[in-house]
Swiss-Prot record:
Residues 49-334 form the Protein kinase domain. Together with RPP13L4/ZAR1, involved in the ambient temperature (above 22 degrees Celsius)-sensitive aerial organ development. Together with RPP13L4/ZAR1, involved in the regulation of the ambient temperature-sensitive intersection of growth and immune response in the absence of pathogens, by repressing the transcription of SNC1. Probable non-functional kinase required for recognition of the Pseudomonas syringae type III effector HopZ1a by RPP13L4/ZAR1 and, together with SZE1 and SZE2, to trigger subsequent defense responses. The record marks D231 as: Required for Pseudomonas syringae type III effector HopZ1a recognition and interaction with ZAR1. PROSITE patterns: PROTEIN_KINASE_DOM. Interacts with RPP13L4/ZAR1. Component of an immune signaling complex made of, at least, SZE1, BKN2/SZE2, ZAR1 and ZED1. Binds directly to SZE1 at the plasma membrane. Belongs to the protein kinase superfamily. Ser/Thr protein kinase family. ZRK subfamily. Changing N173S: In zed1-D; normal growth of plants grown below 22 degrees Celsius, but high temperature (above 22 degrees Celsius)-dependent RPP13L4/ZAR1-influenced autoimmunity and growth retardation. It comes from Arabidopsis thaliana. ATP binds at I55, S56, S57, W58, G59, Y60, F61, I62, W63, K76. Expressed in seedlings, young leaves, floral organs, shoot apical meristems (SAM) and inflorescence stems. It is found in: Cytoplasm, Cytosol; Nucleus; Cell membrane. This is Non-functional pseudokinase ZED1. One of its GO terms (biological process) is defense response to Gram-negative bacterium.
Amino acid sequence: MSKNNKKKRRWDLKNGGILLEELIASFDGKTNPIRCFSSDQILKATDNFSESRIISSWGYFIWYKGVIEERQVSIKKWSSQNLSSFTEAYRDISVSSQMSGHKNALKLIGCCLEFDLPALVCEYTEHGPLNRDGGLSSGVVLPWKVRLKIAKEIASSVTYLHTAFPETIVHRNINPTNIFIDENWTAKLSDFWFCVAIPEGELYVEDDVKGVIGFVDPDYYWTMKVTEKVDIYSFGVVMLVLLSGRAAVFNGPDEAPMSLNDHVSEVMEKGEFDEIVDKEIWNDLGGDDDLVLRRSQVKAFLRLALRCVRYKKEDPVSGMLEVAKELKLIEKLS
């Protein structure tokens, strides 16, 4: 056996054992079947992780476009420099394997355990992940109906994550870049590596703060207590991003970084509703009647987003299930 094959074998055995323990420990040992791919298959599919195959890139990992057995796939490769991500990589696989049964979660096909950190093989989505400002890398402007559809579908996915398993699972990293869009404009939640379970009978768990700046619940930031509210807050910011076309943190008038949440709060205090809304949202209207209906939808959407981020602390939402139901009702207003 060659030196390279021995190394792959060593990683395969080590990673396989850890993955098996993670899968058994998760969700009462009930997991969806996933395939194991060889490193040769992954390298061939991505042209040796060619830059030309990159879908999106972040500090911890890179998403690549590939083809395995004549099927287009998305391949997630963790950075070898981030070995602190070891536990998170396996949690990503274990939670993804459970969430794959939901139509609004990015389906995990399998993984490769022959690298220092496992690579994930997932379904391919035509439009890839959203940008930080809630748009597409192609520059295609998303119509209002698609934005509303994305919010409704991701709310459904997060609700499932919170309620479908023996323990409440909190995502902790809901943001536009973790939302993939397929050819039918169906939204898929991904990247479950920061997930944490709240044991039955407990209201919260304490853990280090995880997430992206601008999407982290302030209460979580100061107390380090993880509850469902962590995801509700992040989702509310995602709604504001979709509504405004702005990133969660953007350059203000003086080029200084500004929080979208703070910006929206300031505008709401002035009663300048239209200043919040992306002007592209009004571009596909058929007439005055359409405008009236659109404005009622957009205002209801904004009110719900503000409840999610607890703009008025006396009127919070009860949970993601309420958010998902409200978004369905808002969609029916059209």
